[in-house]
Structure formats: C-alpha cells, structure tokens
Amino acid sequence: MKNFKDPTDAEVRRYFPDGWAGDVEDKLTAVGRSARENEAFDFVRKLATYSRDHPALHSGKLMQYLPQDDLYMYFRYDAIGTVMVASNTTDKAAALPTASFSERMAGFTKARNVLTSESLDSLATLQLPAKTAVVLELGK
C-alpha cells in the first residue's frame, strides 16, 4: 500500500493472502485486515462496483488530454453518461481550470464525486489535493 518502486515494484505485486490453505491471514474478510487495509479494500470495492454499474467505463469511448504540470485528465463517455478522472501527481495541491476541456465538458454544469458522494456545483476549476485522483460523474 505504500511501495513506490523502492527499490522495485515487487511489493506492489506480492501475493494476496485470501484464506487459502497455507495462508496465515485472510485479507478478504474485514477481521483479517488492519484499519488501513480496510480503507484500501473499501476504496477498490467502491470503484469496482461503480465501474461494473456504469457502461461508459467499460464500453464507452475514451478522450484524454496531454498532462499539464503533472495534472492528467481523461473522460470515459457514452450516450448515457460521462465520467471524468483527474489526477494530480505532484506533492502540492493544485487548481485545475477546466476551460481547455470544453470539447468534452460542454453542457455539463455539475458533478458528483464517485468516491465521496460530494456534489460539485461548479466545474470551472477543480481543486486537486496532492498525490490524488478524483472520479467525477458529470451532470447537467
């Protein structure tokens, strides 16, 4: 959960103990996980469930933009919905003006943060904390 290729990415790809014979731990149950592991597990579950239930994410079109100042933005969309993903890979919070993404954002005036359920009533500028990504379901 915290290894960033230091010195390799082997820790990121390590075996997941899920209760099979010989596993000392069972990370598929909340009892077998730490509070931080439960937080990560719930995060992945929420994203996986959202992806499963929204066709734009698995069968929609992709529109992405070149990263600017280590901020990356892309959209997955279909006739039913549009999902925006914005990522800040820097060590500092950043404000991301969205005017340059008008080709994909035209007509949308609000959004819902998929991870927090927070509503955004303005899409003019996105506030992105350091080292985070947001997943926004756009609305009119």
Locations of regions flagged by a protein language model:
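Loop/helix patches that line or flank the sugar-binding groove of alpha-linked glycan CAZymes
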Residues: 1-105, 128
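Active-site donor-binding loop signature of nucleotide-sugar glycosyltransferases
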Residues: 18, 113, 138
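A residue-level signal for conserved active-site and pocket-lining positions in enzyme catalytic cores
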Residues: 47, 111, 131
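Short glycine-aromatic motifs
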Residues: 60-62, 108-111, 136
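Short, flexible beta-strand-to-coil junctions
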Residues: 77-79, 116, 139-140
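Generic alpha-helical hydrophobic packing signal
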Residues: 83, 113, 133-135
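Solvent-exposed beta-hairpin/edge-strand motifs
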Residues: 100-116
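C-terminal beta-strand-rich structural cap/linker in extracellular carbohydrate-active enzymes
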Residues: 121-140
